[in-house]
């Protein structure tokens, strides 16, 4: 099944995508991870992406579409994967429909105040890039990774100032996707304000229903 996870930053779609990719053996394609890989490798594209992200802006469609399309073309099983962070707007959605058929959409619903709390509490390991949250997914030892004992840090775009810009961009560009997919009966809403285990359970129920139809 080809799944697209929609939702604002901080809705938990990335965390759930990683969990389900392990349980269902789906390939997890995260635009955020793809961008970070380019940044870490200091590619020309990575340098451009880094500047855009640090300014709290969304990466342009031309770059995003190319990165995602290239990645999809490299995976072995193109029938079972999760797209996390793509598409972000109508133009990207149209391009995705051109590339793939029978896409199912999961829309993560969550209150904006809770989003800010989640994102401002997010911490990432400098060594292994595992993601934690001081509010919802704390480490056993403060600011130390549970997996590799690396040092945790807060991304520049997770500060409250950058978050305001990111949420404004989301409301402007990504929210219209809800109507786009709802009109074609592909939208499946899920309450993302609950804890990870509950969200995962509810999502598995939705996936089961989709498979039966």
Swiss-Prot record:
Which residues are listed for ATP binding in this entry? 10-15, 122, 131-132, 194
Which compartment or compartments is the protein found in?
A: Cytoplasm
Binding residues for Zn(2+): 125, 128, 145, 148
Give the E.C. number(s).
2.7.4.3
Segments passing through the bilayer: none
Q: Which GO terms describe its biological process?
A: AMP salvage
Pathway stated in the Swiss-Prot or TrEMBL entry: Purine metabolism; AMP biosynthesis via salvage pathway; AMP from ADP: step 1/1
Q: Where does AMP bind?
A: 31, 36, 57-59, 85-88, 92, 155, 166
* One Pfam family it belongs to: ADK
Matching entries from SUPFAM superfamilies are given as: P-loop containing nucleoside triphosphate hydrolases
- CDD domains noted in UniProt: ADK (cd01428)
User: Subunit structure, per the record?
Assistant: Monomer.
Identify the HAMAP family for this entry: Adenylate_kinase_Adk (MF_00235)
Which NCBIfam families does the UniProt record give?
Answer: adk, PRK00279.1-3, PRK14526.1
Give the family, as the similarity comment puts it.
Answer: Belongs to the adenylate kinase family.
Functional note:
Catalyzes the reversible transfer of the terminal phosphate group between ATP and AMP. Plays an important role in cellular energy homeostasis and in adenine nucleotide metabolism.
Stated name of the protein: Adenylate kinase
Please report the organism this UniProt entry assigns to the protein: Borrelia duttonii (strain Ly)
